[in-house]
A protein has these predicted regions:
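Short, charged/small-residue-rich alpha-helical element at the C-terminal edge
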Residues: 230-297
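Generic secondary-structure transition motif, activating predominantly at the C-termini of alpha-helices
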Residues: 107, 131, 135, 238, ...
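Short, surface-exposed, charge-dense and proline/glycine-enriched linear segments
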Residues: 138, 152-161, 172-176, 232-235, ...
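A general boundary/transition motif marking the beginning of the first structured unit of a protein
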Residues: 4-9, 100, 118, 182, ...
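ABC transporter nucleotide-binding domains
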Residues: 9-201, 206-220, 225-226
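ABC-family P-loop ATPase nucleotide-binding domain
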Residues: 1-29, 289-316
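Exposed, low-complexity/repetitive linear segments and helix-based recognition motifs
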Residues: 3, 41, 92, 205, ...
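Arg/Gly-rich low-complexity intrinsically disordered repeat tracts
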Residues: 316-325
C-alpha cells in the first residue's frame, strides 16, 4: 500500500450517479447503476468489485466518457468525462484486448503513441522500455494475431501506459497472464501509485485486489453495498496473531498454557507458509537462471524507466508536438 496524496479535489467524484438503459421506444429497460456515490483520490489504488452484472463495467465506461450518465454528477479531474483534455490523461486496459491482428507489437504501440502526439524520439524510447517491461522485446516484430492471450494482454497493458497517464483504468488486468506476469502487474500498479498515479482496478481475482488496493467498493445490482479501506474491512479486532521463531517443545507448551489461562480458549498453532504465487515464481526463477533463447515472453521483472521517474509537475505538453512524425 502507498501513502495517499492529499488533494483538495478528487481525481474522480461521483454523486447520485445513475445509468438507465432504454429500449427502442425509450422506455426504461435496465437500471444498470443506481444512485452511487464515491470519490477516488490522487495516488490511490481503488478497487471496483462485484459479481457479473453488478454495474462495474457500466461505471467504468461512464468514467471513461464512453457512456453518458442518465442523471447524477460525475467529474474526472474536475471536468466532464467526455472532455478531451481529461481523456488525454487517462490510460485504459479493457477487459478484452482488441488489437489490430496484422500489426506487430511495436507497430501497435507506435500507433497509440502517435494518437497521443508523442514526438518520435520520446515515442520510440517509451516503446522500447514498455516492450522490455512486458517481456515482448523478442516478439516485437511478430503479428499480434499470432500471440497467445497472455502475450496480447501484455501488449494491451503497454498501450495503456504509452502516454504516461495520470489515471489508469484496468479492467481484469491479469486475465490470461501466468503467475509471473500477474506478479509483475501488481508490482507495476504499486510503482505507479508511489509516483502519485491514480489506479482504478476491476478484477474477480480478489487476492490481487487485496494485495494492491488502498480502498475498494463492492457493487451489487447497480448499487454500492460497501466501501472503505481494505485493512478496515478485513481486520478482525477481536483476534490477535503472533509470529515468532520456533521454540523448543517445552517452551512452546509453557507459552500455550499461559495463553489458555489468559483467554480461556485453545490457541491455534501452525507454521507460516509462502503463497503458491511466491513458490511458483521462485521455482520458475531457478529454471530460467540458465541462458535460453526466448521466442515469446521474456519477463525482466523491471518497470519502464519513464514510468519510474518523478511525478510530473505539469502536463505532458513538453513531450508532444502538433506535427506527428
Amino acid at each position: 500500500m502507498v501513502a495517499l496524496t492529499d488533494s483538495p479535489q478528487p481525481v474522480i467524484h461521483a454523486e447520485a450517479l445513475t445509468k438507465i438503459f432504454r429500449d427502442f421506444w425509450r422506455r426504461p429497460k435496465v437500471r444498470a447503476v443506481n444512485a452511487i456515490a464515491f470519490d477516488v483520490r490522487a495516488g490511490e489504488v481503488f478497487g471496483l468489485l462485484g459479481p457479473n452484472g453488478s454495474g462495474k463495467t457500466t461505471t467504468l465506461r461512464m468514467i471513461l466518457g464512453l457512456l453518458t450518465p442518465t442523471r447524477g454528477t460525475l467529474a474526472v479531474f474536475g471536468r466532464s468525462p467526455r472532455d478531451v483534455a481529461s481523456k488525454a490523461r487517462i490510460g485504459y486496459l479493457p477487459e478484452e484486448s482488441c488489437l489490430y491482428p496484422y500489426l506487430t507489437a511495436r507497430e501497435i504501440l507506435n500507433f497509440y503513441g502517435r494518437l497521443f502526439n508523442l514526438r518520435r524520439a520520446a515515442r520510440q524510447t517509451c516503446i522500447d522500455q514498455l516492450l522490455e517491461m512486458t517481456g515482448l522485446q523478442h516478439a516485437q516484430h511478430r503479428s499480434v494475431g499470432e500471440f497467445s492471450k497472455g502475450m496480447a494482454r501484455r501488449v494491451g497493458l503497454a498501450q495503456a501506459l504509452i502516454n504516461d497517464p495520470d489515471l489508469i483504468v484496468l479492467d481484469e488486468p491479469t486475465a490470461g497472464l501466468d503467475p509471473v506476469g500477474c506478479r509483475q502487474v501488481k508490482d507495476l500498479i504499486l510503482t505507479l501509485a508511489r509516483r502519485g498515479k491514480t489506479v482504478i482496478l476491476s478484477s474477480h481475482l480478489l487476492a490481487d485486489v487485496e494485495h494492491v488496493c488502498d480502498r475498494v467498493a463492492i457493487m451489487g445490482d447497480g448499487v454500492i453495498l460497501v466501501q472503505g479501506r481494505v485493512r478496515d474491512l478485513l481486520e478482525q479486532p477481536d483476534r490477535c496473531r503472533l509470529t515468532f521463531p520456533t521454540l523448543a517443545p517445552d517452551r512452546l507448551e509453557a507459552v500455550l498454557q499461559a495463553l489458555r489461562r489468559e483467554t480461556g480458549a485453545a490457541p491455534a498453532v501452525d507454521h507460516p507458509t509462502r503463497t503458491l504465487e511466491q513458490f511458483f515464481i521462485e521455482t520458475i526463477g531457478q529454471v530460467r537462471s540458465e541462458p535460453t533463447a526466448p521466442t515469446g515472453v521474456a519477463p525482466t521483472g523491471g518497470v519502464a524507466e519513464f514510468l519510474k521517474s518523478q511525478p510530473k509537475q505539469t502536463s505532458n505538453a513538453q513531450h508532444r508536438t502538433s506535427n506527428v512524425e
